[in-house]
């Protein structure tokens, strides 16, 4: 497919938000859209004083989270009686801080952050109540097309990876180990380059492979500088990569608000499940004014085809266990955490039915 040219330097900048999407590390490790205001608000549908104000702090502003933006643009939150204020935190650590301090009512980030906070002894446990993405959002990009790619092809090669302990790097290393590859001995993983700059570095000739989020993966293909040969989301399995969470005290005090919020999200999920990538892209385009519709459609299609978004928001135990397997494999888990302590499916189950 012929794709529009995208400047890799520009894409490197807008990637800064997405790459922090699923890490409790500082925002410069993982991030999209520096042009997005730190605080944005729901699409302009009629609001009035009867609406309940809810502040949502998202880890990044990314096409990866399309169902959320469908819910905003189609007015589903307003329909549920919510006046939503959307804040982009640019890093899971910042999102978690906002939730713990009460600056945000709800946080949207990698669910491993709730595990870290729990292990640190948080008095008011941060509990996940809705899961949006079920795949990792990054891809392995090679210098040439490799229709018969095998993970063994990485042996002896140089790869631009991510920060140690960050979710993108942990997922990558988990896949390597699953395929019998030692991340420390069988290949060289360059962790010295900021994730927002890896696409430009790869385009400039560094390494044999690079791990990229969108829109960088599409940008490299558009410039014929790289080719997606594997999806880390597919090869790692169904991981609860990003989920909505709140303090237990907020959940207990505001069950109706959480239910309405979850209902609105479910409507966004339903729309994504019943419409084409082209239709989804048109709806969310106002959220990404700096990106042309063709590119948005290409990225939505890639995530759509790999089953990134669940049909419901129910956070299942097997996914939570896989997440802990990944953290454990990377040496980032002190001890296993009970699923029931950090997840409630009550709201998502009701919204789904």
Please report, for each region that a protein language model flagged, where it lies by residue.
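Stable alpha-helical elements in mature extracytoplasmic
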Residues: 64-67, 73, 92-95, 110-113, ...
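Conserved C-terminal helix/tail region of periplasmic/extracytoplasmic solute-binding proteins
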Residues: 321-353
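Secondary-structure end/capping motifs
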Residues: 252-334
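Bacterial N-terminal signal peptides that target proteins for export
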Residues: 1-9
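Bacterial signal peptide processing site
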Residues: 23-26
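Short, glycine-/small- and polar/acidic-enriched structural segments
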Residues: 33-184, 189-192, 208-214, 230-231, ...
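Pocket-lining segment of extracytoplasmic ligand-binding domains
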Residues: 144, 194-288
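C-terminal motif of bacterial Sec signal peptides marking the signal peptidase cleavage site
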Residues: 17-21
């Amino acid at each position: 497919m012929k794709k529009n040219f995208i400047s890799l330097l520009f894409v490197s900048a807008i990637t800064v938000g997405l790459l922090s999407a699923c890490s409790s590390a500082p925002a410069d490790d993982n991030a999209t859209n520096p042009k997005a205001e730190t605080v944005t608000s729901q699409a302009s549908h009629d609001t009035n004083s009867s609406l309940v104000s809810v502040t949502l702090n998202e880890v990044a502003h990314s096409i990866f989270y399309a169902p959320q933006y469908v819910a905003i643009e189609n007015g589903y939150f307003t329909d549920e009686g919510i006046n939503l204020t959307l804040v982009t935190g640019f890093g899971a650590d910042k999102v978690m801080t906002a939730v713990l301090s009460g600056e945000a009512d709800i946080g949207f980030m990698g669910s491993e952050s709730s595990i870290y906070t729990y292990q640190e002894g948080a008095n008011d446990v941060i509990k996940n109540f809705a899961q949006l993405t079920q795949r990792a959002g990054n891809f392995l990009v090679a210098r040439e097309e490799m229709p018969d790619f095998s993970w063994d092809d990485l042996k002896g090669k140089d790869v631009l990876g991510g920060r140690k302990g960050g979710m993108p790097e942990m997922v990558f290393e988990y896949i390597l180990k699953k395929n019998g590859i030692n991340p420390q001995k069988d290949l060289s993983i360059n962790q010295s380059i900021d994730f927002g700059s890896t696409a430009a570095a790869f385009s400039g000739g560094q390494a044999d492979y690079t791990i990229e989020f969108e829109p960088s993966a599409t940008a490299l293909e558009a410039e014929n500088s790289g080719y997606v040969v594997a999806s880390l989301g597919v090869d790692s399995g169904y991981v609860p990569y990003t989920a909505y969470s709140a303090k237990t005290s907020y959940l207990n005090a505001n069950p109706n608000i959480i239910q309405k919020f979850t209902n609105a999200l479910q409507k966004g999920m339903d729309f994504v499940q019943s419409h084409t990538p082209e239709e989804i892209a048109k709806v969310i385009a106002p959220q990404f004014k700096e990106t042309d519709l063709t590119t948005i459609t290409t990225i939505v299609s890639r995530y759509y085809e790999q089953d990134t978004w669940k049909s419901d928001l129910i956070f299942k135990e097997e996914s939570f266990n896989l997440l802990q397997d990944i953290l454990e494999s990377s040496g980032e888990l002190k001890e296993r955490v009970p699923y029931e302590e950090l997840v409630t499916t009550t709201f998502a189950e009701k919204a789904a039915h």
